[in-house]
């Protein structure tokens, strides 16, 4: 059984097609790249995979369980699903709302009900991993674009998801931050954890993913 299974997915914004007849299987531990021109539907597909929007028609299964508007009304089911999929938005700023970097990173684990000592360990570990320790007490609105990006990623990986999905991972990063993030993504892939990235950077796809899925201008898989 595939970890992720999309069958004949269609999605429209105000009757304008954004995804057309999308069928896609992703195995546990696979690294998949999504490519396509602006407006092709990459970001829409990522939002659908994260359960933020739902198909107009077709089915989406995660670990053999259907993800739909109906099933996600179950609060326990929704919480379990979102704990397994980590999503870093293209605009990381929209994910940051706490008073400090450390508070941001601790927010997700607290929502999961983890003990404070475990939360402290997770925060410390991910801040060291991504080079955020020195700015732990800094407010997000005082961060550079690269620092915001790394903080958003830290928030996601502090929850130890099974799947990591990133929209334009290198967006807004300086050279040093790109190296840190690339090293992390390589380590994630080497650990055989599922990775899905959407990007225009062909070199990044070549370096990180097992296969590339192209979304065409017709909003289909090419």
Predicted regions: what is each one?
Residues 164-167:
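Catalytic Walker B motif of ABC-type/P-loop ATPase nucleotide-binding domains
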Residues 117-135:
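Conserved ABC ATPase "signature" region
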Residues 50:
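Helix-to-loop junction immediately C-terminal to a conserved catalytic motif
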Residues 58-70, 81:
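Conserved ABC transporter NBD signature motif
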Residues 35-37:
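The feature captures the beta-strand-to-loop junction immediately N-terminal to the Walker
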Residues 139-143, 147:
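Conserved ABC ATPase signature
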Residues 199-200:
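H-loop/switch region of ABC-family ATPase nucleotide-binding domains
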């Amino acid at each position: 059984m595939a970890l992720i299974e999309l069958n004949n997915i269609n999605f429209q914004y105000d009757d304008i097609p954004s995804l057309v007849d999308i069928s896609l299987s992703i195995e546990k531990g696979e690294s998949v790249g999504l490519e396509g021109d602006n407006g092709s539907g990459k970001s829409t597909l990522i939002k659908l995979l994260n359960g933020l929007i739902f198909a107009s028609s077709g089915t989406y299964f995660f670990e053999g369980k259907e993800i739909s508007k109906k099933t996600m009304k179950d609060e326990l089911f929704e919480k379990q699903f979102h704990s397994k999929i980590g999503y870093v938005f293209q605009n990381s700023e929209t994910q940051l709302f706490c008073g400090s970097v450390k508070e941001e990173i601790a927010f997700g684990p607290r929502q999961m009900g983890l003990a404070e000592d475990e939360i402290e360990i997770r925060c410390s570990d991910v801040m060291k991993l991504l080079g955020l320790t020195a700015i732990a007490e800094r407010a997000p609105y005082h961060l550079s674009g690269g620092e915001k990006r790394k903080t958003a990623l830290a928030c996601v990986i502090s929850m130890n998801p099974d799947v990591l999905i990133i929209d334009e991972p290198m967006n807004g990063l300086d050279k040093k931050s790109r190296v840190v993030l690339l090293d992390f993504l390589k380590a994630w892939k080497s650990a055989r954890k599922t990775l899905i990235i959407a990007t225009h950077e062909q070199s990044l796809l070549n370096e990180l993913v097992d296969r590339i899925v192209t979304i065409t201008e017709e909003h289909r898989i090419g």
